[in-house]
Amino acid sequence: SLAENLAEMLLCSLSGLEKITLKIEKPWAPVGLPLKTVSVEITRKWHTAYIAFGSNMGDKKMYIDNGIRGLAETKGCRIEAISDYLITEPYGVTDQDEFLNGVLKMRTLLTPGELLVRLHQLEQAANRERIIHWGPRTLDLDILFYDQEIIDMPDLHIPHIDLHNRDFVLVPMNQIAPYLRHPVLN
């Protein structure tokens, strides 16, 4: 819609703009009702998300770098910070190669669901195959936090389940967001 496109264009092009409320009115709209105007009002804003990334197959760094680049090139997404890459032992299924892991901080206009779809597209572009739970992967991208939201849906859990027990998440999170509080565990 006009309001959606205008809000996105303004938020993406004006660097200091964090939130916008737009009201679009059309006087004497032909809607078949005795109204002087018809209007739509929307509010859109930038959201802060933290994304865990990892790989333990092939050229791990290349897969991660390409995933981050793809995310940075996504309309309505801005990468703000990237942790160091850490070499870590596998979690869950331990009979596999070491992982290269890290975390990034981003700002996005995407909803949590839209962001999840985009992360899955980037994983698919890296030829990720979901054969074994916690098994080897070319690229793994997970939403850790999205603002301070708590979401519990079949395919999306924010904050990410069990992140507080995973050093491969906690160490890079501490590097880029040492004072961030978990919205459930505080």
Short names for language-model regions:
Residues S1-A49:
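N-terminal, polar/charged subdomain of small-to-medium soluble alpha/beta proteins
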Residues W46-C77, S83-I87:
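N-terminal beta1-alpha1 ligand-phosphate binding loop
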Residues L6, L10-L11, L71-A72, L119:
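Hydrophobic C-terminal alpha-helix "anchor/cap" residues
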Residues K23-P27, Y85-I87, L144-Y146:
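Short loop/turn motifs enriched for small/polar and acidic residues
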Residues L6, N56, I82, P172:
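Residue-level signal for inorganic ion chemistry
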Residues E18, K36-V38, K75-A81, E98-G102, ...:
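A generic structural signal for short beta-strands and their flanking turns/coil linkers
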Residues W46, Y91-F99, L110, L116, ...:
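Flexible, gly/pro- and Lys/Arg-enriched active-site loops
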Residues A81-R107:
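Short, charge-patterned binding micro-sites
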